[in-house]
């Protein structure tokens, strides 16, 4: 279909419309364009990377016309598209079993479906936003470990071996595993990584996580530092003048720094979720992220064990 009217009219009622368009104005424009073409009881699912407050606003706008809405966060990238992503669903109206089954079938699989259902139009996108903030933090931790090893004159192969060894220690993650592959990638016998300028842009979710944490008065220093590092990387005058060699005294210390830095980042993200979503079941969130998504790792399994056995999950993690 090339005409929206024809597309809407071709669907059987009650209609289900899944939007996968850029967040912000584009999503709002599409919803505004189709809402008068829809009928009471139809459902709009926003599967984009929308800010959670936008999802709440869009849901309320459609609610006035008695049209249902779900804000659905999706994580997984290209691999998720092929093998199933982690899906974070925010809802207010009751979800039919058929739709639950369809979304669950699409989602990534571990020993269960990597999908979570959270009450509130913006809740699914809130969980996805925090996921992205944690992702920023872990990527920055990996970058800083790389920086230390590089300045201690380790080769790309040696650094890749360091990250590979974390898998044997059950301290690896999807991001760590692909870092090893990136470090070894060559083109015309030259390491690709060595040809890349150290600039890092962002899509806005890291910034939104930081702003939300400030608004909710929840400290997220690891996530903030990661976002700040991206901003600073675009200031050419800063990074060009830095040229300091270092010496690694213990790779065990670096392994511990990376591991506990990741634990701290995860705790910060979960505390932000807890502040916004009272009585949240962390087991659902951790299982939701266990497969398909960018931050999947053994750490999530470890935290899930603690969560299932603890009455004060976050408190116990801080001990």
Segments and roles (model prediction):
Residues 272-275:
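Long, amphipathic alpha-helical stalk/connector segments used for oligomerization, subunit docking
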Residues 56, 194-200, 308-312, 316:
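Metal- and O2-centered redox machinery and metal/ROS homeostasis
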Residues 191-263:
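A conserved active-site cap/scaffold subdomain adjacent to cofactor or substrate pockets
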Residues 27-31, 43-45, 51-160, 169-195, ...:
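Rossmann-fold dinucleotide-binding core
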Residues 1-38, 57-67:
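Conserved N-terminal Rossmann-fold NAD(P) cofactor-binding segment
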Residues 158-165, 223-228, 282-284:
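Beta-strand segments within the central parallel beta-sheet cores of soluble alpha/beta enzyme folds
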Residues 165-166, 170, 277-309:
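Small-residue-rich helix-loop
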Residues 135, 255-263, 288-293:
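Short, surface-exposed loop/turn motifs that are enriched in glycine and acidic residues
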